[in-house]
């Protein structure tokens, strides 16, 4: 069975997170295999989500700000590269909305990569997924937690149930040279400060990026914005911590 919420319930579940537990209890059963939102079917897999998260997907609540900006500024003429694509939720919705010329995702977490590949295949989307992280080209330790959300390049603090694995990284300059993107979509949990230098964005016209003041403070956010400005970009819109930069 595939869950598809009525419009009113979608609105409630999207804007009032506390209601998702109630909806999960109402809709979830052993027969549920997926949910559907905006013509995209999301498989229900316990390895990466519970009932509440599936309801959030069915309501369009996950990564809503990033997706809204991408839909507004990206077009079918773009070659899109996404760093930190996670479960592929934003990638799928953006891909469905704009049908870009080409679409490449980079994600470190092997569990997330497996889910996103299943998601893209189920919805017949031509999106390439690369299990590498944005970095300096070296290999980096990654802590894969039993709870997908707690996985990190840092040792998880809220669980003891994880395993350490090695993940290859790739530099921004190498990605730009190989994929020739016109648009970058990025959410890498603070690593953007070190590994997404605007000076390496030759040929890139649009950057939608989530900044993380909890990692480097408000002064760090301002420093990153100034680096974009110095390298020919202008900030055109912000939704919460997600910023859109366009080349002048």
Give residue spans per PLM region.
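Phosphate/nucleotide-binding beta-alpha loop and adjacent structural elements of enzyme active sites
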Residues: 1-248
């Amino acid at each position: 069975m595939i869950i598809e919420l009525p419009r009113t319930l979608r609105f409630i579940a999207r804007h009032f997170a506390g209601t998702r537990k109630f909806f999960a209890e109402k809709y979830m059963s052993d027969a549920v295999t997926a949910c559907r939102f905006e013509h995209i079917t999301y498989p229900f897999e316990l390895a990466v989500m519970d009932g509440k998260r599936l309801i959030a997907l069915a309501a369009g609540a996950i990564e809503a700000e990033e997706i809204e900006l991408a839909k507004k500024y990206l077009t079918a003429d773009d070659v899109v590269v996404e760093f930190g694509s996670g479960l592929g939720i934003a990638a799928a919705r953006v891909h469905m909305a704009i049908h870009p010329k080409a679409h490449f995702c980079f994600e470190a977490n092997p569990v997330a990569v497996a889910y996103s590949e299943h998601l893209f295949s189920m919805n017949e989307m031509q999106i390439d997924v690369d299990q590498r992280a944005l970095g300096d080209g070296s290999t980096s330790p990654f802590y894969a937690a039993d709870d997908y959300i707690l996985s990190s390049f840092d040792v998880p603090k809220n669980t003891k149930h994880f395993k350490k694995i090695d993940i290859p990284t790739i530099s921004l300059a190498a990605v730009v040279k190989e994929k020739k993107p016109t648009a970058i979509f990025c959410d890498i949990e603070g690593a953007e400060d070190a590994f997404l230098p605007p000076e390496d964005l030759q040929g890139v016209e649009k950057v939608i990026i989530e900044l993380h003041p909890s990692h480097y403070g408000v002064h760090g956010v301002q420093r990153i914005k100034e680096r974009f400005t110095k390298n020919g970009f202008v900030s055109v819109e912000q939704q919460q911590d997600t910023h859109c930069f366009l080349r002048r």
